[in-house]
Amino acid sequence: AICSLVLYLLTLMLMEKLSSNSVDAQEVELVWTILPAIVLILLALPSLQILYMMDEIDEPDLTLKAIGHQWYWTYEYTDFKDLSFDSYMIPTSELPLGHFRLLEVDHRVVVPMESPIRVIITAGDVLHSWAVPTLGVKTDAIPGRLNQTSFITTRPGIFYGQCSEICGANHSYMPIVVESTPLPHFENWSSLLSTSSSL
């Protein structure tokens, strides 16, 4: 519709059916300025509302706190008492056969699939960034500030990520591994980890 209107006006101007009075008319310029502004506002307001609605999950099934350190991650499952661990990269010399070099960790983040997960992210020392591209997640970890992101996994699997903020000499040795499992498996894993950490 817009292209046809522009072509129509261009044709009229080329055929000189628009006089110089109508081309230089301030009323036309005023309409051409105000009308697009109104259209842009009408498009922007609902878009901003939807953007903010997508940003935060009101009632997540699980809240996880990720704390970046030089050069490892600490995870705290805030819905459980005493369920936290440090996650370090497995050195190449200790890597089991078939695992990914520089991407495998000694303790994976395990989450139930098909559940809304909120991750609260911060740092204990310098800037870090918790990024898992296959989940569409990248959030900066800033000392003294809590940032949050959320995701839902729709299938079981293992999702790899990295710290994506240059944080020092061993920046590339801060992998993130998220394992999505069915709810019964997650419940077994969390009870086993809670029991072993309380001993």
Curated annotation (Swiss-Prot):
Keyword Glycoprotein listed: no
Cofactor, how bound (note): Binds a dinuclear copper A center per subunit.
Keywords from the named record: Copper, Electron transport, Magnesium, Membrane, Metal-binding, Mitochondrion, Mitochondrion inner membrane, Respiratory chain, Translocase, Transmembrane, Transmembrane helix, Transport
CDD domains: CcO_II_C
Molecular function GO terms recorded: copper ion binding; cytochrome-c oxidase activity
Compartments reported by the entry: Mitochondrion inner membrane
Sites where the protein binds Cu cation A2: 163, 165, 167, 171
Enzyme Commission no: 7.1.1.9
InterPro entries: CcO_II, CcO_II-like_C, CcO_II_C, Copper_CuA, Cupredoxin, Cyt_c_oxidase_su2, Cyt_c_oxidase_su2_TM_dom, Cyt_c_oxidase_su2_TM_sf
Enzymatic reactions: 4 Fe(II)-[cytochrome c] + O2 + 8 H(+)(in) = 4 Fe(III)-[cytochrome c] + 2 H2O + 4 H(+)(out)
Gene Ontology CC: one annotated term: mitochondrial inner membrane
TM ranges: 1-13, 27-54
Major location category of this protein: mitochondrion
GO biological process: ATP synthesis coupled electron transport
Membrane-related topology note: Multi-pass membrane protein
Family the entry assigns: Belongs to the cytochrome c oxidase subunit 2 family.
Function noted in UniProt: Component of the cytochrome c oxidase, the last enzyme in the mitochondrial electron transport chain which drives oxidative phosphorylation. The respiratory chain contains 3 multisubunit complexes succinate dehydrogenase (complex II, CII), ubiquinol-cytochrome c oxidoreductase (cytochrome b-c1 complex, complex III, CIII) and cytochrome c oxidase (complex IV, CIV), that cooperate to transfer electrons derived from NADH and succinate to molecular oxygen, creating an electrochemical gradient over the inner membrane that drives transmembrane transport and the ATP synthase.
Protein name as catalogued: Cytochrome c oxidase subunit 2
Species: Apteryx australis
